[in-house]
Design a protein with these regions (language model features):
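Positively charged n-region of N-terminal signal peptides that target proteins for export
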Residues: 1-4
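Repetitive helical segments and hydrophobic/amphipathic motifs
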Residues: 11-12
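C-terminal motif of bacterial Sec signal peptides marking the signal peptidase cleavage site
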Residues: 15-17
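Short, low-complexity, disordered segments immediately C-terminal to signal peptides
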Residues: 19-34
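Basic, polyanion-binding surface patches
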Residues: 30-227
Length: 227
């Protein structure tokens, strides 16, 4: 009888310990979640938390052009884009008509919105090709089929990258740049001149587009005074 009571008591103690541990673990999880939601403030600065509007701003305004299933040109604006290596670019994309198109054709072109095309470029980001399949023609833009990939070149954008889809997984598009072409009007000594291209960037904090400014220093040169 005593052995039975001791056994029951031991089981109850174990259950109580487990309950206590679970309660403590839940408290720790809740505390960790609370800490993630409310990061410690940096002294002497305005702290914004993890507000997405300020992450990596300014952002590029890249225009992605594809053919749809009826061979109509489609263009959208994307801002979460960058260079992966010397021949590849990466763009973060959610589900769009553009993603359907590039998965079908395996190709796309990338151009850069500029001061001359602010309204048209913004329109391409506002309106889906699913709703307005002729949106490229609607703004008066024209296209030329790329000779290198199965995608259109938008003639009104003077700098274009012709890309082949390497992969598109979990919203991350990786493209191989097979050719870059530029209109003579934006070149100086045979090189792309940003003062002539006049690309714009997206200011996510102010929700506006901004022009790039003047050169403020020579790359791999301005810092040599500290060597």
């Amino acid at each position: 009888m005593k052995k039975g009571l001791f056994s029951i008591a031991a089981v109850l103690l174990v259950l109580a310990a487990c309950t206590s541990n679970n309660h403590q673990n839940n408290q720790n999880v809740n505390e960790n979640m609370k800490n993630k939601e409310q990061p410690q403030e940096v002294t002497g600065r305005k702290n914004f938390g993890s507000s997405h509007a300020l992450v990596t701003t300014p952002q590029p305004c890249v225009m992605i052009a594809t053919w749809d299933k009826d061979h109509n040109p489609d263009v959208m604006m994307a801002a979460w884009a960058g260079q992966l290596d010397y021949k590849q670019i990466v763009i973060s994309l959610s589900k769009h008509k553009t993603t359907d198109n590039l998965e079908q054709t395996g190709a796309f072109t990338v151009s850069f919105a500029d001061e001359r095309t602010v309204a048209e470029s913004d329109y391409f980001g506002l309106v889906s090709g699913n709703d307005v399949p002729d949106k490229v023609a609607r703004v008066g833009f024209t296209v030329t089929p790329s000779p290198n990939v199965d995608a259109p070149i938008i003639n009104e954008y003077p700098l274009t990258l012709e890309c082949r889809v390497v992969s598109f997984e979990d919203g991350m598009l990786i493209g191989e740049v097979v050719n870059q072409s530029a209109d003579e009007s934006i070149l100086t000594d045979g090189k792309v001149d940003l003062t002539k291209l006049k690309p714009i960037v997206f200011d996510a904090a102010a929700m506006c587009y901004r022009a790039l400014g003047d050169s403020v220093g020579q790359a791999w040169g301005a810092g040599k005074k500290f060597q």
